[in-house]
Amino acid sequence: MPQTIASPPTPEYDLEEVAARLDEGGVDLGDPASVDRCAALLGGLARNRDFLADRLVADLKAAHAGQLAANRYSAQVVLLHRSRRGHFLRANIWPSASDEAYRTSGARAFSYGVPHDHNFHFLTAGYWGPGYVSDYYDYDAEAVDGRRGEPLNLRFVERSSLGEGRMLLYRAHRDVHSQLPPERLSVSLNIMDEGEHVPWRDQYLVDLGTDAARWGTIASRPTLTPTEALLRCAVHLTDNARDIADHMAVSHPVPRVRASAIAALAAVADGTGRTAALERGLRDADARVRDDCERWLTL
């Protein structure tokens, strides 16, 4: 499960100071020294009981006046700061099952009941409320190919909540959690270590359903870069895109992108051409590509 981080005895910080100090020192949550420094800053921000309310009110006023240049909101996320150095700071809002947002949008809009790992490290602190509840597991990424349906050999650790003052370090490709809504509306603060490499790494959604044969296996890999999405569209419009897809299917260093290129080529081919495109993927060096193509051949 995520590593519990003792919140350092730091003073209260405001958002601007935390953002500036993160930008100055950078964020590398794979480095213990960086984790300690970020934990001190996040802990100091979490002690500031006014900054988030002030920020939300200011943004609402700006939006009402037509002055908000960029919408920072999704169903649950408030983007507080994005750095050019590849990290960002955000607040996540977690509605309870009785809140109108939950009833309107449903559980999946807030990732409740969607077991998953992460393809990046992030540091999180409970800011307000009892916090979301998680069943925590861990797994050994080195023992996993990443094929759909592959067992992760999960190890259950505990069920606990991210209450006020609790701080956790979620580790990429190691920690899995299945979240449940809090007893009442809650807020967490996150420092996200999302560098340029992250979009090329797979995230796993995990099957923790009632089918014993599938329990603890990889249900899907939802990560998709803009390049992959664009390629799948462009091959329908121009032969030049098909040439690019043909090249990427062989030479791209990321297995998922090679598989996406093969899928794009197969989508614009008929009959034996589709089969030939997918059979080409059966010779790929990576098990994920071979498995994807084998599955697509049966469809």
What are these regions (language model features)?
Residues 8-98:
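A short, N-terminal "cap"/entry segment at the start of jelly-roll beta-barrel domains
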Residues 38, 226-233, 258-264, 292-294:
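Conserved hydrophobic register position within alpha-solenoid helical repeats
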Residues 60-64, 91-118, 171-173:
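Conserved short histidine dyad/triad with adjacent acidic residue
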Residues 118, 124, 140-172:
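Short acidic-glycine-tyrosine-enriched beta hairpin
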Residues 124, 136, 183-200:
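A short hydrophobic beta-strand segment most commonly corresponding to one strand
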Residues 163-164, 172-192:
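Ligand-binding loop in jelly-roll beta-barrel domains
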Residues 195-240:
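Charged, amphipathic alpha-helical linkers/stalks
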Residues 239-249, 271-281:
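Amphipathic alpha-helical scaffolding segments comprising HEAT/armadillo-like alpha-solenoid repeats
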